[in-house]
UniProtKB/Swiss-Prot annotation:
Protein name: Cytochrome b
SUPFAM superfamilies documented for this protein: a domain/subunit of cytochrome bc1 complex (Ubiquinol-cytochrome c reductase) (SSF81648), Transmembrane di-heme cytochromes (SSF81342)
Cofactors that this protein relies on: heme b
Binding site for heme b b562: 83, 182
Annotated gene: MT-CYB
Sequence similarity: Belongs to the cytochrome b family.
Subcellular location, record wording: Mitochondrion inner membrane
Record-linked CDD domains: cytochrome_b_C, Cytochrome_b_N
Organism ancestry: Eukaryota, Metazoa, Chordata, Craniata, Vertebrata
A GO MF label: ubiquinol-cytochrome-c reductase activity
Native organism: Psammomys vexillaris (Thin sand rat)
Amino acid sequence: MMNLRKNHPLLKMVNHSFIDLPTPPNISSWWNFGSLLGICLVIQIATGLFLAMHYTADTTTAFSSVSHICRDVNYGWLIRYMHANGASMFFICLFIHIGRGIYYGSYIFTETWNIGVILLFAVMATAFMGYVLPWGQMSFWGATVITNLLSAIPYIGPTIVEWIWGGFSVNKATLTRFFAFHFILPFIIAALVLVHLLFLHETGSNNPLGLNSNADKIPFHPYYTVKDFLGGGLLIFFFMLLVLFFPDMLGDPDNYTPANPLNTPPHIKPEWYFLFAYAILRSIPNKLGGVLALVLSILILIFLPLIHTSKQRSLMFRPISQMLYWILIANLIILTWIGGQPVGDPFIIIGQLASISYFSIILILLPIAGIIEDKLLKWYLCL
């Protein structure tokens, strides 16, 4: 009898990707976050679709339509809070996924890594445009401040800003186009995820040792499907805990006030997952310099394969690099905290020092540490 799973044109693709996929036998729970990101994307697309059925992309009715969803639509409050907090869960998983990639040297698979960086930019753009849609105070002023940064581009900057706005300020045209892009981008992200997986399955997964594990790979199912189901269950548990008990914990109270172009909030800030980049932007007094630093703070990930100096792939047996890695993580937490603080005296200098150390660790200290560790290992082996 023909094995349908292995011979059917469609099922064969699923089989090679999720069932008979040869997988390293020693990958840890840090490898769970790829599948968790898939769950997050499905949640976001599903809840977003239902929200789009009731939302109106018009400056006069956008805020009241969100209010209507929460008050009058059956389980509208649940769908809205799942979508809003789903973005936070998405970014938590995303940051851990990237952090694991840096720690274990997954960036050596350059095609997979570069598609991942493009995905990060696409997810950040989607989240930013989604934050504008409820048309609260922070939505309006966040959109105004962040889009206005493009005016720092020489010659063409102001024209680009007006072109994005569809006028001379953030208005109805801006909201309509942001809604259109916010709706279409998740489907583009889903397509890019397939490309990401395609490149990953060309090379096979990395593992904690950073060594080739072709000799002893095991099938993905049942070993890692069970592991992914456990991870997915835990994610949904903590996600629903957040949604049902602390739905506004990660939001901004200013966004419960309808947008008013005549009244600026005392402290304009983006969502928590952009605060580290926002802190880097604010730490440079020059507008163009700040924008370049903002873009580079994420684009720097593209250069990781080029500045990898060690003969070892993973940081598992590299204590100096490990120490620098955890300092970098602490540094990012400090930047996130600084981004949420008002522009005042201790915070400015802390932000500037954290920004300098962020770029220094990645571009200078980690490559030097890789060379030193190789020299130490060579010296030790010669003893």
